Every structure is written in C-alpha cells, then in structure tokens.
Amino acid sequence: MSRYRGPRLRITRRLGDLPGLTRKAAKRSNPPGQHGNARRKRSEYAIRLEEKQKLRFNYGISERQLVRYVKKARAMEGSTGTNLLKLLEGRLDNVCFRLGFGPTIPGSRQLVNHGHVTVNGKTLDIASYQCKSGDTIAIRERKGSKKLAEGNLEFPGLANVPPHLELEKSKMTAKVTGKCDREWVAIEINELLVVEYYSRKV
C-alpha cells in the first residue's frame, strides 16, 4: 500500500485530528460516506485497524514502511509500542515538522526531498533518516531555503517544540539531544492496539 495522496480532510473526518497530516479541522465530525451517521458496534479488529491507520496517515508512511518500523521496534529493548512511536518521531521529516520548519509532515518531507535541510552540516534529502542524539538539523544556508522555513516558523503546525529538540529559531538550527518522550507525541493514539494489530501479521 503506497503513501496516501488523496483528500486529507476525508481522512481526519474518519480518524480524528492528525496534526502531522493537516492543520485543517474537519467541519463535520461524522465519518465520510452515505452512511457516515449510522452508529454500529465496531469489532476489535476494526478498532485496532483504525489506530494503525492513524499512525500511517499522521506520519505519511506506507504500509510496508510501518511494518518495517514495527519489526525494528520489537527488536529493541523496552515497550514495542513506545519504541515504535520513538522511531516515527525520530524521522527527519517529522523532526523538521516538530521544529516548525514545515507546516505539516508532508510539507516538511518536501523541504527535505528538495534539499533545503542539512544534517551535521551536509545536505540530506532522505526523509526517513533516523535522527540521533548529537545531530544538528538546520535549514540550508540559501535564500530560498531560509524564506520557505521562515514563513513556516511564524505559524508552526504545533505550538511547542519537544524538549529533546533544542531550537535556535533565529539561526534556523536545532540540536537533537535524545528521543521524544511519550507525553510529547502529538497524535492521540493507543500504540498497544497497533502492536496487537500486527501481532499475528508480522
């Protein structure tokens, strides 16, 4: 399953607020479709699937990528669910979003893909790069790059920068000091349900 490129509000109407996907809020709270208002009891599978879809759409990754992250999270010490969130939060496109360099994660991914971002002084165009403690993330020293990020920093997608990212806003540079703590994950998610969803699939 490839990365989603369709209407974003349709997704938020179905799954709820996804700050990484879009800033806009759905005007109608009921799910899309002819029977969006109908209330019916959902199965446990449907509930787990919905939580999994929240992660996919919020972080803008494909099913194949998410499966890889789940496998990697399992191999790490500690809670698989927490590890999974830390891995997703550590992606370069998400870090740029959390710093305010991009308006959303897709917007931040474009910044990275188009060569506007540097890591440790070198241009890096790999959005999935896993940022680690000690990395310096910055907007490239180029007028066009600075202008793009400047406008986004004035109106960041999220109000607060997580404490593991030390941002120097005037210089458009930041230092990564560790992993994102669970309480600073912006999306409302039950990661245990995601782990359960993949328990028999991966």
Swiss-Prot record:
Pfam families in alphabetical order: Ribosomal_S4, S4
PROSITE patterns named among the record's database cross-references: RIBOSOMAL_S4, S4
An individual GO BP term: ribosomal small subunit biogenesis
Record bears the keyword Transmembrane: no
Keywords carried by this UniProt record: Ribonucleoprotein, Ribosomal protein, RNA-binding, rRNA-binding
Cystine pairings recorded for this chain: none
Assembly with partners or alone: Part of the 30S ribosomal subunit. Contacts protein S5. The interaction surface between S4 and S5 is involved in control of translational fidelity.
Record's protein name: Small ribosomal subunit protein uS4
Originating organism: Prochlorococcus marinus (strain SARG / CCMP1375 / SS120)
Gene that this polypeptide is encoded by: rpsD
